[in-house]
Amino acid sequence: MPRRKQARRTTVRDIRTILRLTHEEGLSVREIAERLKIGKSSVSTYLLRSREAGLSWPLPIGADEDAKLERRLFGRAGRPPRDLSEPDWALVVRELKRKGVTLTLLWQEYRASHPDGYGFTWFCEQVAAFRQRTSVAFRNRHAAGAVMQTDYAGPTVPVIDPATGVIHPAQIFVAVLGASNLTFAHASFSQQLPDWIDGQVRALTFYGGVTKAIVCDNLKSGVAKALWFEPTLTATFAAMAEHYDTTILPTRSRKPRDKGRVEGAVLIVERWILARLRNRTFFSLAALNTAIAELLEDLNNRTMRHVGKSRRELFEEIERPALKPLPAIPFEYAEWKSAKVHPDYHVEVDKTFYSVPHRLIGCTLQVRLTHRVVEIFHDHQRVASHVRRSQRSGHVTVNDHMPKAHQRYANTTPANLIGRATQIGPNAAILVERMMRDRPHPEQGYRSAMGILSLAPRYGSQRLEAACERALTINAITYSSVASILKSGLDRERPQAEHAAPTPAHTNIRGRSYYQ
């Protein structure tokens, strides 16, 4: 015996078609059943229910949606009407952006205020349907405080140098927050690393907080190797991310959907800001940024059609509380370089030599340069810090970086040497002073003077003082002369005054009157 074919399940659309065929085309129950391939009893039941519900054709306003039509036809008699008030779907979607908020939680809160409301499955379906209807506004959904996306606009703005008349194209940096769409824009003269970093810092300052991640284009100025799984950032960009405790996520080349939020923000900035500035003339970057800031305020305060709130309102409501606080000190742009320590325990940076601890001779160190400071690192530990010289030459040395022997020599000054000689005696002080005075440069007499002082521990201060006196008497102002006097014991003998021989008479002798 052949099995009976199972009847097709009737949908609300079939019920609507039954009403239309009955009232518009005047078909009988049998004809409608044959056309729709459903049972005659089902057609009769639906027509009966429609008459009991007071429905005619065309359907009245309020009963033309599937859910409402089904409630009118199949509501149970004698049962109190259910509380089927629908939630504010825009509010539901905004709440989902908050950290920790789920569909289950929102449905539970909805049922707490509407105990006889819709079930969880229908609730989820309606949220998905609302998101689909507003796909332009919610295409790339991000949790509040999760991401800031950055990029440069394509068009530039001409800035005229008032002194030369030369036109400089200004690049427009754009940033946007993922959840609230709050937008930031700033003009600079290049897309190089200093301006790129400055744009990121200004954007975070504008938002008053830090997102968990920054999604950016893989500019060469910020990304050394644009690998999708393990991108390598430039040292300066990585230092900025570490300073703000955030993660940098470079996008793939030619993949605009990786940063779809900022792609849309760039388009809006071009239409709502740059297009309105097209007929204005700017003579400075500051004037251009002032104009951009004014239009940016209007843009962020304008109500978004699909959300019913402005970017600023959404930011204050859901995004600001989720941002991490800014560090106490803004990031200061710095260049990073590698430098090898020379045998004289200095590294060459920008044609100037800066000292490091002498134990690091031969090592390759990392150097961080700001406009004020030079910091030198070894294995991520700072080993030296110097004030940056404005002149690109010379040496900058810290005594503590020297070996002990070098420190003693570095601390030597004429006053220091004469003071130490004075403790031995007046003749020693005079001898040391003359040693440095008689040289073209005092430094040339340092070693001789230090040699004289080094004789005191061996021979004693009294003998050294006597030897210096004898050396002064015979005009032998050298270290070797004093050492020889001490070695031969001549310091114990009284020096004999030498009588100068009279000058022989000759024609070149000038009389006293010559000098009058």
From Swiss-Prot:
Annotated HTH IS408-type domain residues: 15-96
Annotated region (Disordered), positions in chain: 493-516
Pfam families, alphabetized: Mu-transpos_C_2, Sigma70_r4_2
Residue ranges of every copy of the Integrase catalytic domain listed in the record: 138-319
Disulfide bonding pattern of the chain: none
SUPFAM superfamilies to which the protein is assigned, alphabetical: Homeodomain-like, Ribonuclease H-like
Family matches, as InterPro entries: ArsR-like_HTH, Homeodomain-like_sf, HTH_IS408/IS1162_type, Integrase_cat-core, IstA-like_C, RNA_pol_sigma70_r4_t2, RNaseH-like_sf, RNaseH_sf
Keyword rRNA-binding in record: no
Segments passing through the bilayer: none
Single GO molecular function: DNA binding
Coiled coil: none
Keywords: DNA recombination, DNA-binding, Plasmid, Transposable element, Transposition
Gene Ontology BP term (one): transposition
NCBIfam families, alphabetized: transpos_IS21 (NF033546)
Family classification: Belongs to the transposase IS21/IS408/IS1162 family.
Name this protein carries in UniProt: Putative transposase y4bL/y4kJ/y4tB
